[in-house]
Each structure stands twice: as C-alpha cells, then as structure tokens.
Design a protein with these regions (language model features):
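Iron-sulfur cluster-binding electron-transfer modules in prokaryotic oxidoreductases
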Residues: 1-206
Length: 206
C-alpha cells in the first residue's frame, strides 16, 4: 500500500490521480479479502470517499480499473473503509470498554473531531456532523469529563493545504481553538487525526 493519498493535497488539484491511487489501496485490501481500518481522519476521508465514488459511479470504476490493470490489479467497488474510533464505539461498545477500566481518569478533556471524520456527512453518516457524540462518550466512559467549548467543530487550522500554503493563517486558527478550549478548562486534547495532532503540538511549541 501507499499514501491514501492525502485528500487536501492531491485531490484538490488532480482528482483522477487521487482516485487511482486510492483505488490501488482499496484493490490491495480486496485482494486479501479484508476491509480497511484506519487510525487517521485524512486516510479515512480519502479512502472512504474514493470507495463511495467507485461504488456508485460505474464509469469512474471502469476508468480506474483500466489504470489498475497495468499493475496487475482490479477493483470491484466493494471494499469497506472504517475509522478505528467508529469501530471501538459501534463494534466493541461502551460497556465493553468500561468493563476494562481499572483506574478511572479524573481530568477535563477537550475533544477535537477533525474535518474528515464526519464530513462530507451526506455520505459518511457516522454521527451528527454538528453535534457529534462518539468521541465524547468514549472519553467519558474512561471517567474523564468531555467539556464543551466555543467553536468545537472548527478545523484545527492545517487542513486543505492551509498549513503549507498559508502557515500564518493556519497558526491563527489553531491559536483561536487552543484559547477556546483552555478557557473552558481543558487539561488535555483528544484527537483522532495525526495531522490535527501535529498541528496542535507544533503550534503550542511555536
């Protein structure tokens, strides 16, 4: 497998190349008889969106398979893509997670969902895109308190190529978000996206 590829970079200026690269990953998973489980919002968003397109657009599927046949692959449009947090919440369940908690956490946690975990909501439909609860409930089952804060659903600031194209603007977004969650009493941030995590970590240091 290769990069998902990154939705905010390749997809934004060359969708056909993005779709072909994503389809290669989907085809490799299909070849093993497995679905895909991601731990990254960007990978989840890219692969999920590509799988949705190829499942619903026969012409794009034919076009992609013409490319894939050059590397000995073919995709049937049926590989499922899941996010790790989604699987813990829906397949393992809160009760099972709670039964394994030995030392409940007593802390205030700010949850950051990130853009690609929930959107586009018309095809993902994992949770309410404006008032989601999956991560909040996973946090609270550990004994921690998931706090509400201003502009909770705002982007981390780095997405869509903003970090590389306009780092000052990206930093401004992140600073605003960090100020909001700190004002609400957050001690920790929980995220499910390595790119968001890097942006929060890097901006605090800067």
């Amino acid at each position: 497998a290769v990069c998902c590829p990154a939705p905010g970079v390749i997809k934004s200026f060359e969708q056909d190349a993005w779709l072909a690269i994503a389809a290669r990953n989907l085809a490799l998973a299909q070849k093993t008889g497995a679905d895909i489980l991601t731990i990254c919002n960007g990978c989840f968003g890219s692969l999920f969106d590509a799988a949705h397109i190829l499942h619903n657009d026969p012409e794009k599927l034919r076009s992609v398979n013409k490319i894939l046949r050059e590397v000995g692959l073919e995709y049937n449009g049926e590989t499922k893509v899941h996010h790790f947090a989604e699987m813990v919440y829906k397949e393992i369940g809160l009760d099972t997670v709670k039964s394994h908690i030995k030392a409940p956490l007593e802390m205030n946690v700010a949850v950051h969902y990130g853009c690609h975990f929930l959107k586009p909501s018309n095809i993902k439909q994992l949770d309410d895109p404006e008032r989601p609860k999956i991560l909040d409930e996973l946090v609270e089952v550990t004994g921690a308190k998931s706090i509400e804060y201003k502009d909770k659903q705002m982007c981390c600031g780095a997405g869509g190529g903003v970090r590389s194209g306009n780092p000052a603007l990206a930093t401004k977004f992140t600073e605003e978000k960090l100020k909001n969650l700190k004002a609400a009493g957050a001690q920790y941030i929980i995220d499910v996206c390595p790119f968001c995590h890097l942006q929060f970590d890097r901006t605090q240091k800067e």
